[in-house]
Structures are given as C-alpha cells and as structure tokens.
A protein has these predicted regions:
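Short beta-strand segments
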Residues: 67-69, 130-132, 157-160, 180-182, ...
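Metal-dependent amide/peptide-bond hydrolase catalytic core
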Residues: 16, 75, 161-162, 166-169, ...
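Short glycine-aspartate micro-motif
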Residues: 64-66, 92, 99, 154-158, ...
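Acidic/His- and Gly-rich active-site-bordering loop/insert found
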Residues: 1-95, 116-121
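Glycine/serine-rich anion-binding loops at beta->alpha junctions
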Residues: 75, 91-106, 187, 317
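Acidic/histidine-rich catalytic neighborhood of metal-dependent amide-processing enzymes
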Residues: 100-101, 105-172, 214, 366-367
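A structural signal for isolated positions on well-ordered beta-strands in alpha/beta enzyme cores
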Residues: 44, 66, 128-130, 273
Length: 368
C-alpha cells in the first residue's frame, strides 16, 4: 500500500487538465515510465489528433480482457495550490484522486500482483490496459481506439470510481446538441419590425424540446447554456441553446435524435440549425450481468465484502464497449466522493481489497 500511495502522489501532482494536450502528453510519458517500473514493460504511446493515450498489451494473441482508464482530469493548472495532494485520517485527497487516478494506479498494481504471482508475463497474455487522455471531453479521439481494442474481448473492466462502492451495472447514454436559430438583426428602437428575433423563436422552441423527455423511461432532455444577440439595442440575429440528453435505452436515444433533427422554425424568416448528436450509447444492464455475478463469487473466494450493484445516470467509456455488446463491468476503481468537486477524495482502506478483486477478475477471464 505505501507504494500505491507514492504512485498516486506522483500522478496526482502532475496536473493533466483535458484541454491542455501538452500537459496530458507529459503526464502520459511519466505514467508510461511508472508502468514500466511496476510491470517491467513500457506501454505504447499513441497520439490521435493531438491527444496522447497509452496502450499496454500482453501477448500477441486475441485480446481477452481490457482495463479502461483515463489520466486526464477536469481540474485546471494551479488547482494543487488550493487542493494539494494529502493523506490524512484514512482519506486521500487531490485533484483527480477520485476521478479517476486511483483507479488507474489500481490497474497497474493489480497487473503487477498477477505478474508477481505467476512469475511469467505469459500468464497475462490477452490483457490490454488502456489509459486515455480525453475522457472528460467526451473521448472524441479515443472512442474508436477503445472500441477497436475491446472488439471480441471476454470482459472490459472500467476503473471509474464509485461514491458508495457499488459496481455500475448500467449507465445512461449521452447525446449533446446545439440548436441555433438564425434570424435577422435590426435596431430594437428604430425599426424592430424589420428584424427576425432569433431569441424569441428559440424561447418558443425550448419548452418543446424539453417535452421530448420521458420520465417513465428515464429519458432526460435538458436545455442548458443559452446565448442570444450581440447588444441590448439590437434584435438578435442568432440565438443558441445547448441540449443535454440522457437515455437508458438505445431506442429512446434514437427517438430523441430523430426528433431533435426534425425541429423547425415557425417564425417567418427564421431558420433552425441542429448540430451534435449521440456521443455515448446506453450501457444496458445485460452487458454487466454475468460479470457482476462473477465478481460477487470471487469476492467471497478471496474473503472481501461482496460488492453491490447499481445503475447511474452518468456515462463513461464503458458505454462504448457495452453498446457494442462487449461484456462490461464499471465502477471498479476508488471508493470515495467528490467527482469534479472540491471535496474530491478516495477512502484509502478500500483500495487494497478492490485491487485484489480486480486482480481476481482479470485472472478469472484470462484463464482458458
């Protein structure tokens, strides 16, 4: 455990905000060196559209197990000055400690445990560790890498954290849209009748968009950020709203996508432009069921508390693999709280048993 805490301090104090590709690249290089120190093999450093990711494959045969991690965080440079890395009273704190650097270090140490037990890296043939650099931005450069690497795998284990320790058996899919109304500017005092008020038309559309939601099916459609106009005395020629969509079911996600693209203007002279679309497909419960059952069995075998399962609204990279029909179990990382919040922390006593469970899950799926 002391080595894990040392490694966590090392990665947390790097600062890897998602938007800073250079910082993410530097963090990836340091993490690659750490991986080589712990498991004796350096991962590949992959750059996709300017974003750096790491991939460590064991063996040359088919991929059987994929560990999904990310090393980018939502925290800007300088956060450590306010929220420094600390270990006190059984709590680990620092930016990214919960989401999800603890899970990433757990992946590395679970792999090291298995190597030490086997004494030979061939025991891990079929294992891939992925550590991406843009998860907090929607995985725009890494989603295809994830899907390609996991294709045909027996299991994908996602090292995202869990506030209550429950493993994630289902997650909502996410879609993001930008609805822009194009109108015509005019002087608001001299000749407003010559304008086409994009703000008014957007105000008419937003309740209609929100009504696409279906509470019974768990589908949420939420207009969020809104912009309109340029100056207080000008009829707005352009107005835009961002729409956040979450859906438990693929059919619902597709329904919303169809309805969003059918949005039309009614105000004469106004036009509507809808951009964006589906980002992550729903992670439906069937994808995790047998892996969760096996996790419960293995927990009993190694003498730790049986995990519980839950469904959540937030998405992860596991949505991509679950959406492709690959068995996927999520939430295997840190136990704590405060994702994207200043009280972010991980409970230290939970790290060793969950690392042991991860090692058991990996070995179980690698066994022929």
């Amino acid at each position: 455990m002391p080595q894990m805490l040392t490694d966590l301090e090392r990665v947390i104090t790097l600062e890897t905000p998602s938007q800073d590709h250079d910082a993410v690249a530097a963090g990836a290089r340091d993490l690659a060196a750490l991986i080589e120190e712990r498991v004796g093999t350096a991962p590949e450093v992959l750059e996709i559209d300017g974003v750096t990711h790491l991939r460590l494959r064991f063996g040359s045969g088919p991929v059987k197990v994929v560990l999904l991690n990310h090393q980018d965080t939502v925290w800007p440079h300088g956060t450590l000055e306010r929220l420094p890395f600390s270990v006190a009273d059984g709590i680990l704190r620092g930016p990214g400690s919960f989401d999800m650097l603890t899970g990433t270090i757990m992946s590395i140490h679970a792999t090291a445990m298995l190597l030490e037990q086997a004494g030979d890296s061939s025991a891990l043939d079929g294992l891939t560790i992925l550590i991406t650099g843009d998860e907090e931005l929607g995985s725009t450069t890494s989603s295809q890498l994830i899907r390609d690497e996991a294709a045909g795998a027996r299991a994908v284990y996602v090292m995202e954290a869990s506030a209550a320790g429950s493993l994630k058996l289902a997650r909502k899919g996410t879609s993001d849209y930008e609805v822009t109304v194009h109108g015509k500017a005019a002087h608001a005092g001299l000749e407003p009748e010559k304008g086409v008020n994009a703000g008014l038309e957007l105000a008419r559309l937003m309740p209609l968009i929100a009504e696409m939601a279906d509470d019974e099916k768990g589908t949420t459609v939420v207009p969020t950020t809104i912009t309109a106009g340029t100056t207080p005395n000008t009829v707005p020629a352009k107005a835009t709203v961002h729409v956040d969509v979450r859906a438990r079911l693929t059919s619902e996600q597709e329904r919303i996508d169809s309805e969003m693209r059918a949005v039309k203007a009614e105000m004469p002279g106004a036009e509507v432009e809808v951009t964006g679309g589906i980002n992550r497909p729903p992670f439906e419960r069937d994808a995790a069921a047998h892996l969760f059952d096996r996790a419960v069995e293995l927990a009993g075998e190694i003498g730790i508390a049986e995990p519980t399962g839950t469904a959540v609204g937030g998405a992860s990279d596991g949505n991509f693999t679950a959406g492709d029909g690959i068995p996927t179990l999520d939430g295997l990382g840190a136990v704590g709280d405060g994702a994207h919040a200043e009280h972010e922390h991980a409970i230290i006593s939970e790290i060793p048993p969950r690392t042991a469970l991860l090692a058991a899950l990996i070995a179980d799926q690698l066994a022929d």
